[in-house]
Amino acid sequence: QLFINWEEQVMARWPNAKFNDGTIWDNDNYWAKGTIDDDENAYSNGTIIDDPYTNSAGTLISLSSEGFDLDETNKQAIAILNLGSFRTWSRLVTNHSGNTFNYATVPSWKTKHHYYYFEGRKEFLDQEGEWWVDTYNNKDSLYYVAASGVDPNKLDFRGKVQSYAFSVNASEYLQIKNLEFFATTVYFSNGDNCLVYGCNFIYPSCSKRMLRIVDTEPEMTKFAS
């Protein structure tokens, strides 16, 4: 995660969406769609055929019109796939041609309401507030699109650097009280009578897709046995 003035910025993606106007949650207008609702036999698990449409803002969302190279060797796009009603997975694009792409199959695949978007390639970096990390050539290079007229050297950048501020194993009667956790959280394992009380957790967990880690559950707040 990347933050400016404590606000989360958007990982470079297609179709574009933002946090500050709520469009990032609007899958009917700011995600791409598969044709499965028109024909449940149009394709099978592991394939999506894009269904072009014009969203509520008047923007055409059409994969074939973008000219992307989604399956470039070692630089494949990451597809975020909502293919199981309330379940979403991330997968590398394994093959792409025109309006069709392939990915490693997912569990609980359903023949209705397929939504998706892409991350993981620099060509998606085209909107103010988006960012991308170059994991191909120089892992120290971070790209950010600042607002028009804004000098990025004067912005207050902060980045998530760890999953857990406290990772506690086999402990008893340990208490964490009245702390604020920003872009980090806590993990307890095999403990007894441990307590987290009066704490604020702001952006505690996130995927590691920017580091090209896919098909992995985010490291979340946990009390594990």
Region locations from a protein language model:
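Extracellular polysaccharide-degrading/modifying enzymes targeting complex plant/algal/animal polysaccharides
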Residues: Q1-A224
